[in-house]
């Protein structure tokens, strides 16, 4: 299962990686508009098979979105899963979960940290 978090606070749930990669353009992924995790809370980084292309022709800027796959990367610099979940406000309709709390329970059962670390230490 792939979880995609967008900068507007939405969470998308995909059962197949291909569906997640098809939903979000490579240029947006490269620019951090969306970040991905698996349902155990492990970050997924984009591995570009075909790079994004950008250029200018006179005064017109053009962009061709590249193709990518998602690779597990627990050492990436993206936000920890609990923070991405905490900043989310909307779960997009999907076949797995009705509300964000359902998603939170599912990933917690798989071992993901879903709450902020205790800062009282």
Per-range role (PLM):
Residues 1-18:
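Short, extreme N-terminal segment that most often corresponds to the first beta-strand
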Residues 24-26:
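Long, charge-rich C-terminal accessory regions
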Residues 30-121:
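Low-complexity intrinsically disordered segments
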Residues 15-22, 50-53:
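A short, sequence-level motif marking secondary-structure junctions
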């Amino acid at each position: 299962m792939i979880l995609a978090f967008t900068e507007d606070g939405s969470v998308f749930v995909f059962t197949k990686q291909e569906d997640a990669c098809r939903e979000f353009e490579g240029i947006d992924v490269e620019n951090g508009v969306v970040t991905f995790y698996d349902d155990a809370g492990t970050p997924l980084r984009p591995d570009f098979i075909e790079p994004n292309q950008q250029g200018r022709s006179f005064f017109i800027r053009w962009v061709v979105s590249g193709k990518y796959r998602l690779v597990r990367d627990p050492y990436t610099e993206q936000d920890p899963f609990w923070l991405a979940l905490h900043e989310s406000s909307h779960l997009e309709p999907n076949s797995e979960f009705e509300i964000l709390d359902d998603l939170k329970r599912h990933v917690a059962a798989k071992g993901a940290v879903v709450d902020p670390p205790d800062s009282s230490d």
